[in-house]
From Swiss-Prot:
Catalytic activity: ssDNA + n NTP = ssDNA/pppN(pN)n-1 hybrid + (n-1) diphosphate
Originating gene: dnaG
Entry GO CC: cytoplasm; DNA-directed RNA polymerase complex; exosome (RNase complex); primosome complex
Cofactors required: Mg(2+)
Keywords tagged on the record: DNA replication, DNA-directed RNA polymerase, Exosome, Magnesium, Metal-binding, Nucleotidyltransferase, Primosome, Transcription, Transferase
Subunit-structure text: Forms a ternary complex with MCM helicase and DNA. Component of the archaeal exosome complex.
Record lineage: Archaea, Methanobacteriati, Methanobacteriota, Stenosarchaea group, Methanomicrobia
Gene3D superfamilies named among the record's database cross-references: 3.40.1360.10
Designated name of the protein: DNA primase DnaG
Length: 517
């Protein structure tokens, strides 16, 4: 008997006989007509006894005096021997008294079929059985972290508001929207958090904000903005942090959480942004509570006082000395104290080295005391000069030396006329005409327009140009590609709106922009 486990190939053949025949007739014809045909090594009887050939299966049907069917011969021989055996079956031309014809149409590789079944089954096992029984290592880690976060989650007050374990002991707390936000921040080690559960702020949270430095950390959507508005009305918060637009705090990763908290802004900026009116007495309370917010309170009062008492007017001097400022005192203070106080002496360069140009619309200048600002000597001060516009004046003499409040004045230096470059005379009319049109003009040696084309077609057109081109003016960016094409055409002038990333320019080419003309 043939062991089906060792079968390598199955020979599929079909038989057509002119007459009625049965299975024993076909099997007998196969053994009888192939006996001694292939030699002793490939004799079917010997091969079947040794198990190299399996049981021959025959399936036939007789209809209308003719018989049709299929013959299956299992083989454990190699490919060559199996092919010889299959070819020998086609030599059978008679079965019993009837003429017959056998034709082999397939040799099936049993091992290939088994491999396909193995692959399909392996896919099923991998997708279903592993997911159901064996969790991933990341799932195990997430499960452990989740259990730890749930254990650390505590509750505050009679309403059992979810919060972090350090919300009572910490000097600063973070107000979040919901329980999921607290769990996400606990995951990254932030434990001084408490949630409000929506826009209805619990009274316990509002009372807690009066004792601590509070940061409101909300989602980057409309709901987060509404929570901030509610907190500004019923609670006392110091800073506001927002998640990125369209994201929730519970979905942020550690890097996004840290970045959002570092970018928190003082509550005063949020009040100005949303245009919210503070409750009566709340603004004074914010300044008086120095113990709660030690950073912001000292900065507010000096800034307001300085802004009200002094107006700074910068004096431009052609000198390497630090910038000087004129501090304009109020008129009432000037009248009462101008004669009593002596002004400090400030060393200034000689009058012949100092000149100042003042716009023609400058007005009267009030009594000033010129004071050097040593704290800003290492950097440039703002160049904004404030002058009253009561009466137009053509020029105001500049102060050059100060002694006890008196200034020595010199007339301003004359304005120098800058000569117009020849390129400006030649190409400026073309630049003005092409501004905003996205077109280009190709000029000859006499600066006459040879052709006017679109900027997008300029590079391809210059490649095919054979006429004598001297200059190209166009409303676009000068690129390295255009420079190379212009150089190959011996173009001397290339004028555009601005210069892009250019690594090299030929020595005989002039590259200009509209601002250079």
């Amino acid at each position: 008997m043939q062991n089906t486990d060792t079968t390598k190939y199955i020979i599929h053949s079909k038989i057509n006989a002119d007459g009625v025949i049965e299975r024993p007739d076909i099997v007998g014809a196969i053994f009888g007509q192939t006996e001694g045909l292939l030699g002793a090594d490939l004799d079917l009887r010997d091969l079947q006894k040794t198990g190299r050939i399996g049981r021959i299966e025959v399936m036939v049907t007789a209809k209308g005096g003719k018989t049709k069917g299929n013959i299956f011969v299992p083989s454990s021989l190699d490919k060559v021997e199996t092919s010889i055996l299959a070819a020998s079956l086609e030599t059978i031309d008679r079965v019993g008294p009837c003429s017959a014809k056998i034709e082999v149409f397939q040799v099936e590789d049993v091992r290939a079929v088994k491999r396909k079944k193995i692959i399909e089954r392996a896919k099923l096992i991998f997708t279903k059985m592993f997911d159901e029984t064996v969790p991933e290592s990341q799932e195990l880690a997430d499960e452990v972290r989740q259990s730890v976060r749930v254990d650390e989650l505590t509750y505050y007050g009679k309403s059992r508001i979810p919060c972090g374990p350090n919300v009572l002991n910490s000097d600063a707390i973070i107000i979040l929207e919901g329980r999921a936000d607290i769990l996400n921040l606990l995951r990254y080690g932030i434990k001084n958090t408490i949630c409000v559960g929506g826009t209805n702020i619990p009274p316990e949270v509002a009372e807690l904000t009066k004792k601590k430095t509070v940061t409101a950390f909300t989602d980057g959507d409309r709901g987060g903005e509404l929570i901030i508005r509610e907190l500004l009305q019923v609670a006392d918060i110091d800073y506001v942090a927002r998640a990125p637009d369209g994201k929730c705090v519970e979905d942020l990763v550690q890097k996004e959480v840290i970045r959002a908290l570092r970018r928190k802004v003082p509550v005063e900026q949020i009040i100005e942004k949303y245009g919210i009116q503070e409750r009566e007495g709340e603004e004074s309370t914010r300044v008086e509570r120095g113990s709660k917010r030690k950073i912001r309170a000292p900065e507010i009062a000096p800034r307001i006082t300085e802004k009200k008492l002094h107006k700074r007017i910068k004096i431009h001097r052609v000198s390497s000395k630090p910038d000087l400022y004129e501090e304009e005192l109020p008129e009432e203070e000037t009248k009462g104290k101008a004669s009593a106080k002596a002004f400090e002496k400030v060393s200034v360069k000689a009058a012949e080295k100092v000149s100042e140009m003042v716009p023609a619309t400058a007005g009267k200048v009030k009594t000033r005391s010129i004071v050097a600002k040593p704290q800003i000597s290492a950097r440039k001060a703002p160049a904004a000069a404030r002058v009253s516009r009561e009466k137009p004046a053509e020029k105001v003499p500049s102060a050059v030396k100060v002694s006890r409040g008196e200034a020595v004045r010199v007339s301003p230096a004359p304005v120098k006329t800058v000569p117009v470059s020849p390129e400006a005379t030649r190409f400026r009319p073309h630049v003005e005409a092409l501004k905003g049109t996205l077109t280009a003009r190709i000029l000859d040696s006499q600066d006459k327009v040879i052709e006017e084309i679109a900027v997008r077609d300029l590079a391809s057109r210059l490649k095919t140009y054979k006429e004598n081109i001297q200059s190209v003016v166009f409303d676009g960016v000068i690129t390295q590609r255009l420079v190379d094409i212009a150089s190959s055409n011996a173009i001397k002038n290339l004028i555009g709106v601005k210069i892009g990333n250019i690594a090299k320019v030929p020595a005989d080419m002039e590259v200009l922009t509209a601002s250079m003309l």
